[in-house]
């Protein structure tokens, strides 16, 4: 039942998204849902996976008490289970939604430490990347306490299992099921020749391990946290770990992972 369930809607700048968001808002208000952007129970994204990622980061520090639901205004996405033609089904699903049956996906904790002792901590749903603006990046890569390699190339991407189908896949990474509690590190255009060597392939790193990148001192590093990009200098280290933080999706019409992969990259199989 509804009982005044608190929701909030987030869309993108497209006219179609604005139109669908407005229509869904009217339906939800008529059904006595409470609109609360400060402490929502469910955040509904109207757009694509990028809109859902933006919504997640808007509520990054409330993930322990917020669930998400995606309405796609184009085609089925990895984080969006409904289309713009399913608005009444969305409302019905929200009525029946049970928090105890939410679907949980792991997030990667990213801790950036600077040479002056300052630190920032973020969580990512898809991936985090590090690269330099226009020159070769050099950095030591540690797996837990072991110095694994000295990387040279354009950059590195560290992804979650759900994020393995995003940027990670485009740079040759493996697709990993979300039930596999692991991180994946993939190289971005690494240098491999008789002088410089890296592993040259993606790696699946176990849940108990950490990945630490210690980049060479430079002042033009670019870090991404999902779709958010920041420029930094004086970076001492970047540590990636699975600390148990998850994102929760309302279990309304959840599409199985391999079905999502097949529909997104293969299409109909005859």
UniProtKB/Swiss-Prot annotation:
One of its GO terms (molecular function) is NAD+ kinase activity. Its EC number is 2.7.1.23. It comes from the Bacteria. It is an enzyme of class 2 (transferase). HAMAP family: NAD_kinase (MF_00361). It is found in: Cytoplasm. The active site is at 49 (proton acceptor). Its cofactor is a divalent metal cation. NAD(+) binds at residues 49-50, 54, 126-127, 152, 154, 165-170, 189, 227. GO terms for biological process: NAD metabolic process; NADP biosynthetic process. One of its GO terms (cellular component) is cytoplasm. Transmembrane segments: none annotated. Involved in the regulation of the intracellular balance of NAD and NADP, and is a key enzyme in the biosynthesis of NADP. Catalyzes specifically the phosphorylation on 2'-hydroxyl of the adenosine moiety of NAD to yield NADP. The keyword Transcription does not apply. It catalyses: NAD(+) + ATP = ADP + NADP(+) + H(+). Belongs to the NAD kinase family. The keyword Nucleotide-binding applies. The lineage of its organism: Bacteria, Bacillati, Bacillota, Bacilli, Lactobacillales. This is NAD kinase. Keywords: ATP-binding, Cytoplasm, Kinase, NAD, NADP, Nucleotide-binding, Transferase.
């Amino acid at each position: 039942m509804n009982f005044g369930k608190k929701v909030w809607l987030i869309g993108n700048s497209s006219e179609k998204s604005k139109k669908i968001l407005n229509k869904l808002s009217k339906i939800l208000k008529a059904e006595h849902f409470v609109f609360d952007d400060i402490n929502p129970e469910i955040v509904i994204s109207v757009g694509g996976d990028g809109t859902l990622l933006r919504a997640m980061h808007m509520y990054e520090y409330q993930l322990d008490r917020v669930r998400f639901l995606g309405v796609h205004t184009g085609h089925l996405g990895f984080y969006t289970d409904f289309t713009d033609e399913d608005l009444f089904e969305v409302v019905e699903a929200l009525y029946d939604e049970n928090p105890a049956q939410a679907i949980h996906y792991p997030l990667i904790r990213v801790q950036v430490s600077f040479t002056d002792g300052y630190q920032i901590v973020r969580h990512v749903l898809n991936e985090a990347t590090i690269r330099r603006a226009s020159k070769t990046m050099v950095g030591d890569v540690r797996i837990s306490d072991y110095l694994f390699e000295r990387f040279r190339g354009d950059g590195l991407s560290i992804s979650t299992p759900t994020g393995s189908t995003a940027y990670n896949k485009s740079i040759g990474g493996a697709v990993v099921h979300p039930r596999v509690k692991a991180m994946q590190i993939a190289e971005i255009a690494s240098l491999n020749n008789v002088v410089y060597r890296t592993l040259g392939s993606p790696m699946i790193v176990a849940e108990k391990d950490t990945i630490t990148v210690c980049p060479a001192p430079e002042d033009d590093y670019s870090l991404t946290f999902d779709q958010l990009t920041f420029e930094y200098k004086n970076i001492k280290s970047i540590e990636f770990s699975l600390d148990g933080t998850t994102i929760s999706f309302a279990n309304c019409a959840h599409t199985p992972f391999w079905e999502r992969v097949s529909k997104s990259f293969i299409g109909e199989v005859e």
